[in-house]
Amino acid sequence: MQTIKCVVVGDGAVGKTCLLISYTTNKFPSEYVPTVFDNYAVTVMIGGEPYTLGLFDTAGQEDYDRLRPLSYPQTDVFLVCFSVVSPSSFENVKEKWVPEITHHCQKTPFLLVGTQIDLRDENSTLEKLAKNKQKPITMEQGEKLAKELKAVKYVECSALTQKGLKNVFDEAILAALEPPEPTKKRKCKFL
């Protein structure tokens, strides 16, 4: 059975672990536990063929900046996550996360993933953002950044309601299986 390795990166507390747990177990975790490193595996059927989708969770906290890249070799696709209600996590996609993955895995495809879309219309969240003269990140802003950074696509979801959740992983699988241009090997390699 062919395995697809999918690594999830992004700032701490943007919902990376919730995204994976909600997708793999259909349950939303109730408390926040910062991740050091975890992985999950699910079997998916693509065109009648079974594939193992290996999902690798990473810690977004800076303390793990040297440890995190150890999970990057052999990656087929990255999910670069930010919370749509955390403008700083959106900024860090461009400032930190895409530079980090492209430094280690230049040709590996990645999706830009907006998380926590259920909070986009929540009053307390909007008030908190307004106090700092901020607004939630829009779908259009996500699509624009994805294009600018050459992501395969921009997708967004809520791990809580599961809206858009399956689509995130369907798109990740498609990105990993897209036939590469003949001159490029797309799997991440460390030299």
From Swiss-Prot:
Keyword Methyltransferase: no
GO BP: any one term: establishment of neuroblast polarity
GO MF term list: G protein activity; GTP binding; GTPase activating protein binding; GTPase activity; protein kinase binding
Main location: other
Subcellular location: Cell junction, Adherens junction; Cell membrane
PROSITE patterns reported for this sequence: RHO
GO cellular component, one term: cytoplasm
InterPro entries: Cdc42, P-loop_NTPase, Small_GTP-bd, Small_GTPase, Small_GTPase_Rho
Span of the annotated motif Effector region: 32-40
Highest taxon listed in the record's lineage: Eukaryota
EC code: 3.6.5.2
Sorted UniProt keywords: Cell junction, Cell membrane, Developmental protein, GTP-binding, Hydrolase, Lipoprotein, Membrane, Methylation, Nucleotide-binding, Prenylation
Residues excised as propeptide: 189-191
Lipid-binding residues (covalent, S-geranylgeranyl cysteine): C188
Protein residues bound to GTP: 10-17, 57-61, 115-118
Catalytic activity: GTP + H2O = GDP + phosphate + H(+)
A family per Pfam: Ras
Family matches, as Gene3D superfamilies: P-loop containing nucleotide triphosphate hydrolases (3.40.50.300)
Family statement: Belongs to the small GTPase superfamily. Rho family. CDC42 subfamily.
Function: Regulates mbt kinase activity and is also required to recruit mbt to adherens junctions. Together with mbt and Frl, regulates photoreceptor cell morphogenesis. Together with Frl, has a role in the neuronal development of mushroom bodies.
Binding partners and assembly: Interacts with Frl (via GBD/FH3 domain); the interaction is stronger with the GTP bound form of Cdc42. The GTP-bound but not the GDP-bound form interacts with mbt and gek. When GTP-bound, interacts with Pak.
NCBIfam families: small_GTP
Name by which UniProt lists this protein: Cdc42 homolog
